[in-house]
Amino acid sequence: MSLGIDISTWQDVRDYGTLLGQVDYVLLKASGSNTGSNYVDSKYHRHANAIGGRKPTGSYYMNGASDATSAARFFVSNLNSNADDFAVLDIETIDGYAYWSPAKSLEWVHEVRRLGYTGPVFAYMNTSVAQSADWSALERAGVGLWLANYGQDNGSLTSPSPGAGSWSTWQVHQYTQQGRLAGYAGPLDLNRAKAGIFTSMPSANDPATFWSAKRWIISGLAG
């Protein structure tokens, strides 16, 4: 499987070259509404421009106060072209806001695609959220599961079979918040992705049958 990190305003990366040399892809926090209104993460564009296309890079939106349509429009309008290889909706209870329902989450996905985004789309959630609702409508729409399940959360993989709740399977597994990699002094979220998922998720044109290869091919990572 391939190794990836996700970073946001909390990660003040200085040595991007060393850090990128150890990972296969990067997910950046782009925007969200968990503070009460839509905002752009303060380090989003810095991270995206520093990475500069050297690795497959995606962006995520954190759910919160906004309605789904406005949130999708805000996300797309602020999407950095250096970080548009895949899109992720972060679905979680945070800062007093309940996690978005499957219907609201699907509305966000549909609006993102209506606005012209054709890359792979994922829904990020922990095991509890994955088990607490029926997410099959998102899966039928071609959305993949980015599952957070940390096990012992000690920097290593301690939950090799995390399950998938109401989903048929997961595509990416965030397995620790305590990862350590050269090039960054603090803890990092580490993720393992199944081989080829960033180029084999269904496209917006025909989720059931058309498999897109947007910009990158992650090769040699089967496992």
Where are these regions (language model features)?
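Glycine-rich, charge-decorated loop segments at or immediately adjacent to ligand/cofactor-binding or catalytic sites
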Residues: S70, V129-R140
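Substrate-binding cleft of extracellular glycoside hydrolase catalytic domains
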Residues: M1-T118, A141-G142
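Aromatic-lined carbohydrate-recognition surfaces of secreted/lumenal glycan-active proteins
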Residues: Y117-S132, G144
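Structural signal for conserved beta-strand scaffold positions within catalytic alpha/beta enzyme cores
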Residues: Y61, D90, A123, L147-N149, ...
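Short beta-alpha junction loops
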Residues: A65, T93-D95, M125-A130, G151-Q152
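Functionally critical loop-and-helix segments that line ligand-binding/catalytic clefts
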Residues: M1-G17, S136-W216
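Sec/Tat-exported extracytoplasmic proteins
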Residues: A30, A48, G52, L79, ...
